[in-house]
Amino acid sequence: MTFRGFIAVDVAGGPVLNAFAADLRRASPSLKVVDTDQLHLTVKFLGDTEEGLVPEIVTTIREATADLRPFEARVRGTGAFPSLGRMNVIWVGVDGAEPIARITDSLEASLEALGFPRERRPWKAHVTLARVKGRQDLDRVRRILEVHASEEFGTHTVDAVHLKKSVLTPQGAVYSVVETVRLGQ
């Protein structure tokens, strides 16, 4: 049996980020905005994941994070991939995620040995807030992103890394935790 897997760090929404997400939701029917209780920083997207590999994946996460202690990360700034002019994904940035950035190389190597392909693009700390599904009212969305480009959305204590699964539904993806690795334990 397989599931759509990924490794992530949860990010709390908070009132400022929740209000920003609500502004985006109202700005354009072309956006599919992520529920703020589902926000996360993806460390590594795995894709189709055999349930039998879960213990090895968790061991890989545990080994990669062995020296990490809980730390503070700041949710700050906005942007879009690949660019504001050609938005597919709207994101908020994460400052202070360097501890996670440092483990991505070892995770990539260990997960490649388990059959997961390496990510070709460099890792960038961000939280996906919305996906663009059409082209209606995107100028309004661009203006909102520009206004909030350096906005502080709050801080978050990173104290765990999760193996998660994603179930795609017509309303959007629903995420659940498969296993958790606590930092500093």
Label each residue range with its predicted role.
Residues 1-185:
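Histidine-dependent nucleotide/RNA phosphoesterase domain, centered on the 2H-phosphoesterase fold
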